[in-house]
């Protein structure tokens, strides 16, 4: 789905409208197939009550519009209540979590996760004396690893608000829209 979105965006920039239409049709079919295969109507989710299982269908557009508010509410409850402001994602889920929450303006949730100092969190790594990012939240494997660096993008695009303008590819136009969150002072 993500690759089809990229192809569609490239086709759009190049003015290849027929290719955009083909991508739209394939995207609609793929999203519907994934939704049908994985959405549990009884539970109102895509598998289990973990953050990546909420974020991926939201980010990929798999969740129909009617389901999106409830999924986002469940994700928020999972972050704030079940996990007490912590992530329960791995390296891939963390990247997509940061990207989607920034894109929908939920920088408050990202900020909450950033400000945790207990396990599992970046703050926990710092509390344990880390000077680099670890491969695993518990510090078991590599202590100089890039797998949890995905949130650095949030510092630029979310917190500082430096964003590309989709209507003007190649940074021909830049959007500056900083997030006002928590106790951050400028």
Regions found by a protein language model. Give the residues of each.
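Generic recognition of stable, solvent-exposed alpha-helical segments in well-folded globular domains
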Residues: 2-6, 18, 22-25, 29, ...
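Sec-exported extracytoplasmic/periplasmic mature domains
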Residues: 9-13, 32-39, 80, 102-106, ...
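Residue-level detector of alpha-helix boundaries and kinks
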Residues: 12, 19, 42-43, 82, ...
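Non-catalytic C-terminal accessory modules of carbohydrate-active enzymes
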Residues: 11, 25, 108-186
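Well-ordered alpha-helical scaffold segments within catalytic/enzyme domains
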Residues: 1-17, 55-66, 96-105, 156-162
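Extended glycan-interaction surfaces of carbohydrate-active proteins
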Residues: 25-94, 112-119, 123-135, 181-186
């Amino acid at each position: 789905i993500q690759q089809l979105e990229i192809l569609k965006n490239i086709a759009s920039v190049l003015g290849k409208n027929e290719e955009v239409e083909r991508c739209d049709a394939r995207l609609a079919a793929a999203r519907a197939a994934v939704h049908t295969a994985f959405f549990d109507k009884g539970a109102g989710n895509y598998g289990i009550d973990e953050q990546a299982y909420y974020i991926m269908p939201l980010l990929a557009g798999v969740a129909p519009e009617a389901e999106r508010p409830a999924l986002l509410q469940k994700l928020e409850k999972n972050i704030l209540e079940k996990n007490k402001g912590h992530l329960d994602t791995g390296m891939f889920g963390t990247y997509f979590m940061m990207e989607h929450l920034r894109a929908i303006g939920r920088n408050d949730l990202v900020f909450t996760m950033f400000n945790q100092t207990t396990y599992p969190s970046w703050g926990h790594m710092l509390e344990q004396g880390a000077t680099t990012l670890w491969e695993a939240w518990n510090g078991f494997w590599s202590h100089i690893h890039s797998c949890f660096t995905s949130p650095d993008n949030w510092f630029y695009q979310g917190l500082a608000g430096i964003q590309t303008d989709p209507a003007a590819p190649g940074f021909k136009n830049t959007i500056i829209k900083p997030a006002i969150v928590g106790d951050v002072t400028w």
